[in-house]
Amino acid sequence: MIIKNGKVFQEDGSYKVTDLYVENGRIVASADEVTDKTELDASGLKILPGLVDIHSHGAVRHDFSDADVDGLRTILQYEKSQGITSYCPTSMTLPKEELLKIFQTAKDVEQDETCARIVGINMEGPFLDPVKKGAHVEGYIRKPDIEFFRACNEAAGGMIKLVTLAPNMEGSEEFIRELHNEVVISIGHTAADYGCAAEAMKEGALHVTHLYNAMNSMGHREPGVIGAAADNQDCMVEMIGDGIHIHPVTVRNTFRLFGDSRVVLISDSMMATGMANGLYELGGQEVTMKDRKATLADGTIAGSATCLFDCMKCVISMGVPEREAILAATANPARSIGIYNEVGSLTPGKRADIVLTDEELNIVKVL
């Protein structure tokens, strides 16, 4: 296929009016490498890389933690329709037996061209700090456990790419030292202070789970996890871009503080995403969704009800430059879990995960 005359998003964040060549599901460098010369006229359209969501629990009334193959497939189909072509289903804090079944589901689900591709699993619990549990069930939280993690990863067929860890919990140092070369260790759901977080980063935990949420605020005398992450140039940070979790001023300042290569936009979406107001569930707890805000009975925010593409558009509406927002939803998440060689930009050799939009970034077609 040859996609003609579109404004193609470049690796440097600029747009270039040019043709894009696709052969056997990969982007190639020239028309000479294309056997199927079918043309798609993209005049007046923007061409973006497919988005990469590394932190999402579910959508359209299904949750990864349901351990249901058909439900997971439905999630993947919804995500693809919304311009998300690479996806990390994300678990909640649950008993080990349930987690093993959940991770097996990701191995077994049937995927085709109608689905976002599972590029890894995000294991958000159970190695969290009860003080900052958020929407996770405290009774299932446990200390960091290397063998527990490895059993889960074995059930997942080695697909776990991310695991959240509270570095102030007993056993975290050993966990980080032992596993940081096997999985991306993400600091989150923690009351850790700056010193604790900085030491964990020094040991190899170079990712932060949904920055600002479920952690202490950054103070001028105690910078906490946020300050430690800002100070460590190798640390990447997730940020929920739904317009509910974080104030627009903080969103804009985060991009200024961390630059255009370290912010990873995530949806943190749950099963109410793509649905009407009503009652839903997350991690075994009832959630009320009203006007895109999902909360537990006590008012705790319980994930988002917004897909990543809409999160990206939301932060642009807050004043984040378009190029930075797109990079934060494509290249940065891909780099953060080590798959940028395959996805995240429209570069020859990579997967032809392509989203065509109008000038206002309304989706026209997803390839």
Give a label for each model feature.
Residues 1-48:
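Histidine-rich, glycine-flanked metal-binding segment
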Residues 6, 335, 345-367:
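C-terminal cap of metal-dependent C-N hydrolases
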Residues 50-52, 186, 263-266, 355:
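Residue-level marker for buried hydrophobic side chains located in beta-strands
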Residues 45-69:
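Di-metal (Zn2+ and/or Mg2+/Mn2+) metal-binding site signature of metallo-dependent hydrolases
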Residues 95-101, 168-170, 186-191, 240-252, ...:
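Active-site glycine- and acidic-residue-rich loops that bind
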Residues 196-324, 329, 335-340, 360-362:
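Active-site-adjacent C-terminal substructures of enzyme catalytic domains
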Residues 123, 130-146, 150-224:
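Divalent metal-binding pocket/active-site signature
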Residues 57, 61, 73-102, 116-129, ...:
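Divalent metal-dependent hydrolysis catalytic cores, especially in the metallo-beta-lactamase
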